[in-house]
Amino acid sequence: MMNKLSEEEIQDKLKKFDGWTYAKKSIHTSFQFENFKEAFTVMTRIAFEAEAQQHHPNWGNVFNELEISLSTHDADGVTEKDFKLARAIEDIVESTN
């Protein structure tokens, strides 16, 4: 099991993640895409990465907007696993722009 990070550790790590915030035991972000197809394409790529990492986002999609929250349920908070997936998500989104 991964160790839960302290709020100070989380805030420090978030400095490397533009547009991500910490609230309610999770890290959160949102993205806006050109259209639904682009949003869904990114979601599909994230889904494959999440499956490979065996760590899955809590997310929502309305048309061209995607909201993502990450936390580690077993640790009841944020762990390194969340930041690893967040980095992969950032890389996926950047590669589509």
UniProtKB/Swiss-Prot annotation:
The record's listing under Pfam families reads: Pterin_4a
Q: What class of enzyme is it?
A: lyase
Q: What InterPro entries would the database entry show?
A: PCD_sf (IPR036428), Pterin_deHydtase (IPR001533)
Q: Which GO terms describe its biological process?
A: tetrahydrobiopterin biosynthetic process
Q: Which Gene3D superfamilies match?
A: Transcriptional coactivator/pterin dehydratase
Q: Write one Gene Ontology MF term.
A: 4-alpha-hydroxytetrahydrobiopterin dehydratase activity
EC number(s) recorded for this UniProt protein: 4.2.1.96
Span of the secretion signal?
none
Query: Where is the chain membrane-spanning?
Result: none
- UniProt KW keywords: Lyase
Tell me what reaction this enzyme catalyses: (4aS,6R)-4a-hydroxy-L-erythro-5,6,7,8-tetrahydrobiopterin = (6R)-L-erythro-6,7-dihydrobiopterin + H2O
Q: Which family does it belong to?
A: Belongs to the pterin-4-alpha-carbinolamine dehydratase family.
Name of the featured protein: Putative pterin-4-alpha-carbinolamine dehydratase
Organism in which the protein naturally occurs: Christiangramia forsetii (strain DSM 17595 / CGMCC 1.15422 / KT0803) (Gramella forsetii)
